[in-house]
Amino acid sequence: MADTAHQCTIVGIAGASASGKSLIASTLYRELRAQVGDHNIGVIPEDCYYRDQSDLTMEERYKVNYDHPNSMDHALLYQHLCELKAGNAIELPQYDYVAHTRKSETIHFKPKKVIIIEGILLLTDKRLREEMDFSIFVDTPLDICLMRRIKRDVNERGRSLDSVIEQYNKTVRPMFFQFIEPSKQYADIIVPRGGKNRVAIDILKAKIGQFCE
């Protein structure tokens, strides 16, 4: 049943892979949740909307360009944002980074006063931009992003060092310059230095906190 009295503010956080988007989103969520409660704020990672690839072999999945907009099911994400804004709950997909496809289970996600969505390609899609009440681009030097990506993918996602570097050179870096960096022009706020920028986080927290009241 829809919550007709519900008003939902969508905040988008974009930027390069391993730029600090998730850290900013989780920091804002953690600190604001302590102030306004879990029912008023939530986070949706764009990664949840990687396309289901259960019909592909593992070899075919390895060859997919996961940094290209076509790898994302933005149509479903757009539909879910519209549902949440209408006061309806959604079934949030879950993605398996080891199997390179969606998990069978979903998470029941209820509408919130503020929903933070974060991901590399969010600002490349006009439909998604139009659903955002304001947007942020995390601007972190690519060499720092690469070091963070290596650490994350090897330690958390079961990747080999060689595979991470190969993917970075083949798709991550080229797609950044083709799609992600140009989408910076659509951001309302640009945050340098990623999640280490405490001043920016405090400013964003104050701004987003207004919508949680």
Curated annotation (Swiss-Prot):
Any one GO MF annotation of this record: ATP binding
Reactions catalysed according to its record: uridine + ATP = UMP + ADP + H(+); cytidine + ATP = CMP + ADP + H(+)
Binding site for ATP: 15-22
UniProt KW keywords: ATP-binding, Cytoplasm, Kinase, Nucleotide-binding, Transferase
Cell location: Cytoplasm
Gene Ontology CC annotations of this record: cytoplasm
Gene Ontology biological-process entries: CTP salvage; UMP salvage
Pfam families linked to this entry: PRK
Pathway stated in the Swiss-Prot or TrEMBL entry: Pyrimidine metabolism; CTP biosynthesis via salvage pathway; CTP from cytidine: step 1/3; Pyrimidine metabolism; UMP biosynthesis via salvage pathway; UMP from uridine: step 1/1
Record EC number: 2.7.1.48
Listed InterPro entries: P-loop_NTPase (IPR027417), PRK/URK (IPR006083), Uridine_kinase (IPR026008), Uridine_kinase-like (IPR000764)
Main location: cytoplasm
The family this protein is said to belong to: Belongs to the uridine kinase family.
Database matches in HAMAP family: Uridine_kinase
PANTHER family: URIDINE KINASE
NCBIfam families in UniProt: PRK05480.1, udk
Name this polypeptide is given: Uridine kinase
Gene: udk
